[in-house]
From Swiss-Prot:
GO terms for biological process: translation. This is Small ribosomal subunit protein bS21. GO terms for cellular component: ribonucleoprotein complex; ribosome. The keyword Transmembrane does not apply. It comes from Ruegeria pomeroyi (strain ATCC 700808 / DSM 15171 / DSS-3) (Silicibacter pomeroyi). The keyword Transmembrane does not apply. NCBIfam families: S21p (TIGR00030). GO terms for molecular function: structural constituent of ribosome. PROSITE patterns: RIBOSOMAL_S21 (PS01181). Keywords: Ribonucleoprotein, Ribosomal protein.
Length: 68
């Protein structure tokens, strides 16, 4: 991954790098890989995440329809 430093502004380049890494999910993956996760725990976590995403999507859809 590359980030260009313009006008010797390292702070801005670091912010851009952090944003790219966050978008790619690198920090989340590092956190998950710190400890071994049993397959059953992984399955339960992924199921909970899917439920959370579905609820969020339904909430956004309801809000959008209510606004129109």
């Amino acid at each position: 991954m590359q980030v260009s430093v313009r006008d010797n502004n390292v702070d801005q380049a670091l912010r851009a790098l952090k944003k790219k890494l966050q978008r790619e999910g690198v920090f989340r993956e590092m956190k998950l890989k710190q400890h071994f996760e049993k397959p059953s725990e992984k399955k339960a976590r992924e199921k909970a995440e899917a439920i959370r995403r579905a609820r969020k999507l339904a909430r956004k859809k309801a809000q959008r329809e209510g606004m129109l």
